[in-house]
């Protein structure tokens, strides 16, 4: 499957088309709703912020109903969303085993863990090798059972280490790629953490150029 397909607020009208595409290309689909939009600071720089809460809650309920319908029809889908928090712990996609969970937006990873630790949820870090504080993975706050694997290759490039051939220069405001936060650093700290590749393309699921997850 493609474990990182972000659908935005302004794309929710295309949700049924995305689902039909997923059904043709992947065996199951964990969809990751993207509750952010790009706004401009006073200096003109781009900065991501959450949409209005009412908007994203409406989208969440629309997604919940669509996932429920597909599951009842026999196609396995799972609800999820992208969590960024303050940016100090890295971006994670949160996925749920059941279809009844709320979408929460705490600022720190530990708060996210505490909110979901008694629910059937996982939080998968991605583009982990961006610098610490700029949405790269903070291995000091990592919870192994909550985040059992990491996305190390996607449209952002390769996060396995900071010397590999696939750089991470697509989003300079999140860079540069560093050894401090890369996947290998997590292994060196003794974590048992698997690896996957995913799209992170923000258009449709299973764009295979950026890799997929084998289950």
Language-model regions: role of each:
Residues 1-215:
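Extended, charged catalytic domains and RNA/DNA-binding interfaces, predominantly
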